[in-house]
């Protein structure tokens, strides 16, 4: 019978044995507990931890990448105009590069500064609408936009919806961009052009900037957009020629981008524009060479901004460029003859400060531009960069 009870009785777990051991009085157990209690009493307390000064840098995990400087940190966007634009976009099913690319200036450009009324925000707001969906056929190593070889088909109502939304906001300047659509025969050029024409029909007073891809090098498709009635044609070279194969999708080349900008100007566009990211491994000599190439083809506007890694799946930041270096590139570019230069850590290709200046040129200098041309205005305009009358 005792044997049967032993079989039926569940075995004691190690934890139970451990408790039993501690519960059994013994000189060795008491000694261990006493030493442990003494260590707790004589050791550092909570006050000792929180009274110490916090070090400037706490090492956690991978520290190979440079630390984000304080001047690159931005506040959470808010405000009446910000909420209005966001609501309209959702209602019409439209996408913005501001959201898709996680732009740090979204609160600023959408009129989300604290204290701004809806009317004040709208008058200062600039939104960058992303056409042809939110999925790109290319995979640049710096970009956070979704990618696919077979994105969804185009929305035939998008040109009308976009024009309706823009005319409703009462903005003075709008930027249209798009994902790359290498799956389409025309790269989406006709869709892009139709959107511009509808905007100009519904709100002819609005100035339109088109930030396009390279249309796989097809200059005929560049012409379709360039001759649609837009005011500014933008195409970003993104980085210097030497780094282009490592930064951009393999189908994009530096020389191909130059041809796009050059052809847009030859097609009759008043102002051409491009953007360069700093902090991806470029040298000063390479940046200067890129600027000279841009001036050879009469590009009017250039912007400089800091590359910021969207996720850990994207290429690392090589370095964070100091604001003083951005100021230096602004001066260098102006001396090379660019009509306008926006340069700063948080500047992006469609940053509103540059648009205010371009809007002033296109509106206030319309007659002069018609008679003289952009290149002849460069000298007189540079003197008034800090005092713009809208």
From Swiss-Prot:
Residues 119-339 form the Radical SAM core domain. NCBIfam families: lipA (TIGR00510), PRK05481.1 (NF004019), PRK12928.1 (NF009544). Pathway: Protein modification; protein lipoylation via endogenous pathway; protein N(6)-(lipoyl)lysine from octanoyl-[acyl-carrier-protein]: step 2/2. Residues 23-48 are annotated as: Disordered. Belongs to the radical SAM superfamily. Lipoyl synthase family. Its cofactor is [4Fe-4S] cluster. It catalyses: [[Fe-S] cluster scaffold protein carrying a second [4Fe-4S](2+) cluster] + N(6)-octanoyl-L-lysyl-[protein] + 2 oxidized [2Fe-2S]-[ferredoxin] + 2 S-adenosyl-L-methionine + 4 H(+) = [[Fe-S] cluster scaffold protein] + N(6)-[(R)-dihydrolipoyl]-L-lysyl-[protein] + 4 Fe(3+) + 2 hydrogen sulfide + 2 5'-deoxyadenosine + 2 L-methionine + 2 reduced [2Fe-2S]-[ferredoxin]. [4Fe-4S] cluster 1 binds at residues 98, 103, 109, 350. This is Lipoyl synthase, mitochondrial. InterPro entries: Aldolase_TIM (IPR013785), Elp3/MiaA/NifB-like_rSAM (IPR006638), LIAS_N (IPR031691), Lipoyl_synth (IPR003698), rSAM (IPR007197). Binds 2 [4Fe-4S] clusters per subunit. One cluster is coordinated with 3 cysteines and an exchangeable S-adenosyl-L-methionine. [4Fe-4S] cluster 2 binds at residues 136, 140, 143. The lineage of its organism: Eukaryota, Fungi, Dikarya, Basidiomycota, Agaricomycotina. It is an enzyme of class 2 (transferase).
């Amino acid at each position: 019978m005792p044997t049967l009870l032993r079989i039926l009785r569940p075995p004691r777990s190690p934890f139970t044995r451990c408790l039993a051991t501690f519960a059994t009085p013994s000189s060795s157990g008491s000694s261990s507990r006493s030493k442990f209690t003494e260590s707790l009493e004589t050791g550092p307390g909570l006050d000792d931890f929180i009274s110490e000064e916090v070090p400037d840098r706490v090492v956690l995990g991978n520290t190979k990448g440079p630390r984000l400087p304080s001047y690159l940190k931005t506040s959470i966007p808010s405000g009446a105009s910000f909420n209005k634009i966001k609501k309209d976009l959702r209602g019409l099913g439209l996408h913005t590069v501001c959201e898709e690319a996680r732009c740090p200036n979204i609160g600023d450009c959408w009129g989300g500064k604290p204290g701004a009324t809806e009317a004040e925000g709208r008058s200062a707001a600039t939104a960058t609408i992303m056409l042809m969906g939110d999925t790109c056929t290319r995979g640049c190593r710096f970009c956070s936009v979704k990618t696919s070889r077979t994105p969804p088909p185009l929305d035939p109502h998008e040109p009308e919806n976009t024009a309706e939304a823009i005319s409703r906001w009462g903005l003075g300047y709008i930027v249209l961009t798009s994902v790359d659509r290498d799956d389409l025969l025309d790269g989406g050029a006709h869709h892009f052009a139709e959107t511009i024409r509808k905007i100009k029909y519904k709100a002819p007073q609005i100035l339109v900037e088109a930030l396009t891809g390279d249309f796989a090098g097809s200059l005929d498709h560049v012409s379709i957009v360039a001759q649609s009635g837009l005011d500014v044609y933008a195409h970003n070279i993104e980085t210097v020629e030497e780094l282009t194969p490592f930064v951009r999708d393999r189908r994009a080349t530096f020389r191909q981008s130059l041809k796009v900008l050059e052809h847009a100007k030859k097609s009759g566009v008043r102002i051409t524009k491009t953007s360069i990211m700093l902090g991806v491994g470029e040298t000063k000599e390479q940046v200067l060479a890129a600027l000279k190439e841009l001036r050879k083809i009469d590009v009017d506007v250039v912007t400089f901004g800091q590359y910021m890694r969207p996720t850990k799946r994207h290429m690392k930041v090589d370095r964070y460029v100091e604001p003083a270096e951005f100021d230096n590139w602004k001066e260098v570019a102006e001396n090379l003859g660019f009509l306008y230069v926006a340069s700063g850590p948080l500047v992006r290709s469609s940053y509103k400060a540059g648009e205010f200046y371009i809007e002033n040129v296109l509106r206030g200098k319309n007659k002069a531009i018609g008679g003289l041309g952009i290149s002849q205005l460069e000298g007189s305009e540079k003197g008034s960069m800090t005092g713009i009358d809208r």
